[in-house]
């Protein structure tokens, strides 16, 4: 049993160089003490969160951010740190009261550029010390991301423009500046968690010689359109990439608006010429094309591509084309490097003529791979390593040895920096940072197991199981089955600050995490099966996993818990589990599919998955109120509740709301009111239905949260409600 308290002396020493610069509002590492080795929600929120590592130009120092949380102040704050490549000489560079983000080294390593308070700033760096901050931009709309060109003559930055398709009263009458209303005549007027009053845009400006302002900045997309660059809601500076010549910029953009935007995923790769202002399309059709990245010599451009328009979970392919930057820009024919690779590509990183990337694989872990331009792909991380590795942020070569600098995490610990060493004698890893050792070392260990469960159609389904500390198979434990969101995702070794399975196990629960149909680590066939079959085989997969666990003599009562599609699954299983589960928790779940179709924002998702399509194009077809059973109002809508497709009709007829008369098990419904993906009325409707069926039920609504619960105090309350519910129905 580990209850050793490691003092914060090491962390305090790293702050010595900047303690005289502590800003008002600064949030530092927690000195929390754990009682009896049991992890708590408070301990989870106390963990430092590492992000955005960057290697110095000389290859010796890693720059990274760490965010700490104050529950009392109800916020988090990120500051900058450095350490040597081997993890030694950890230094804290900033101690600001507001978060620092997007930190980057200057080309010679003498400065660090970063965003602070919505503007680009710089500070001199020398011998582990950061000098006085200087603001480089004055952009009234603010800056959320940037990338400096290789020769440091130009900078790309992300800001925003007003969305003229969504009007407010003050737009037509300035005297109505206190009136609050939104007026529109087109989709999409809101996205994820916000009304689309602004549109993200990317600009190019001179760098270094003068202050960056709107007056000396050029909008890459030009004027007279409302296209997004980068794509909302998750896109950032990774959607733009400087060419080595510091003149050309590759970027990803979906050049659509209105209803076409709402039904299509057709983003394409373009190259912008900073000198001529011209743009060349590298791709023109299909689904998402994202994350462009130039090779170091500028002779190749790579990106991630989905083949089919409208299918946001299509296989993420590694694409490449030849390019020439001599006297302008020319591009060759795009090609997929390896069409036989049956998993999704993420995080492409060039090193010479090789590309490193990460991918979720059949062991239900995220592994690192290396590809050459001939299409050969080799797995770098070992199959017996139960970690999720991110793509490397740097590759160091010395003779025949290769060192990948990256980050990793597991079900047992959050993100840390790590080095993966590749030698002829074998591959090994060594952890660089130990940001949370002073907290994790106070906790009792939980154990894990990977098992295969037979499904109703005699396939083998991988499941992770976590066991509580000091697990004893002669005793009886309450258990929790995790029903996954997505629906296209994977229960891997990823750490979560919301659904933290180690925290769950440390409360005395056995936790099973099935990778049912629709998960992404087991090939495209396994993933695609779920589209058009929400009430079908994947629900049977969950029942198979639950029955497998309940067959063990050490398992007592069992809960079913999930968010998003997992919330839908909880609502669905409430009506079909035949007494398998003793309570349910549904967070941000779909209760009524027909209602959701008319209120969600990303129509492409519901259109594809509800109709089970295999091909799609948003282009307008026949118009009219009835269309052809698939086309309505000029749009192909095979997944609509008014479509005549067999899969769509089955889908809506089998909505969880159709099964409420079979509900008989206690259920907790949780929802955020700023959730525009699955609006909060879904949670209210499910709770109301449970009440009307006489089922013990509880509703928790967060007025200021979206699909996720992000504010620290709300997160703490969310955890208390979840564990109070589990304890009430499984332990008492």
Task: Indicate where each model-derived feature is located.
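Conserved beta-propeller blade repeats
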Residues: 47-62, 97-113, 140-155, 189-195, ...
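Cap/lid segment of the alpha/beta-hydrolase catalytic domain
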Residues: 433-557, 563-564, 598
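C-terminal motif of bacterial Sec signal peptides marking the signal peptidase cleavage site
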Residues: 15-17
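Beta-strand-rich domains and repeat architectures in extracellular enzymes and scaffolds
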Residues: 42-78
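Short loop/turn segments that connect beta-strands within beta-propeller blades
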Residues: 84-88, 124-129, 207-211, 273-277, ...
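Active-site-proximal cap/loop segments of hydrolase catalytic domains
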Residues: 513-732
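Predominantly five- to eight-bladed beta-propeller fold
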Residues: 26, 77-78, 160-212, 217-223, ...
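Short, solvent-exposed loop/turn segments at conserved positions within beta-propeller repeat blades
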Residues: 72-78, 115, 194-198, 260-267, ...
